[in-house]
Amino acid sequence: MEKNMSYWHQVPPGPNPPDEVYVVVEIPKGERNKYEIAKEFPGIKLDRIIYSSYVYPLEYGLIPQTYYSDGDPIDAMVFMSQSTYPGVILRAKPVGMMNMVDSGDVDNKIICVCLDDPVYSKINNYREIPEHVLKETENFFETYKKLQNKEVKVTGWEGPDKAKQEIKKAIEDYKKL
């Protein structure tokens, strides 16, 4: 794979991965537009407007210079008190992983908190995030594709050790590209 000027290839995975990573925001909290970092050129493109009336409940993006089992950079969701915009690079701490199956394929998400947000920066494990907020997140992902007749199932949550293990593997797999 040719490594071009995409955010995926040009931004490092973080200042101290896997404990402190960069997350490139693709979709801000509160959006229905599903943006994606372009893999083939610098920039961000609109993938689609989601079919439901739901909006993303948190910042959603990717950890650069990673390669996951789905052939894309590893997905990351960042809990923070304010929304940003596509292309913003956040300093984030992995605190867990949401295990998910999307249309029959594994599509796990790394759960992070923004290190520059005093509301969330002291959280070290996803279990410290209010249970209702986690349920809202789970509900969003299990519901937002229903009008497309696609099934998404959250199959569980894991702690920061598993998340960091997945990040390490994704960084190593990226280096093999």
From Swiss-Prot:
The keyword Lipoprotein does not apply. It catalyses: diphosphate + H2O = 2 phosphate + H(+). InterPro entries: Pyrophosphatase, Pyrophosphatase_sf. GO terms for molecular function: inorganic diphosphate phosphatase activity; magnesium ion binding. This is Inorganic pyrophosphatase. Homohexamer. Keywords: Cytoplasm, Hydrolase, Magnesium, Metal-binding. Mg(2+) 1 binds at D70, D75, D107. Gene3D superfamilies: Inorganic pyrophosphatase.
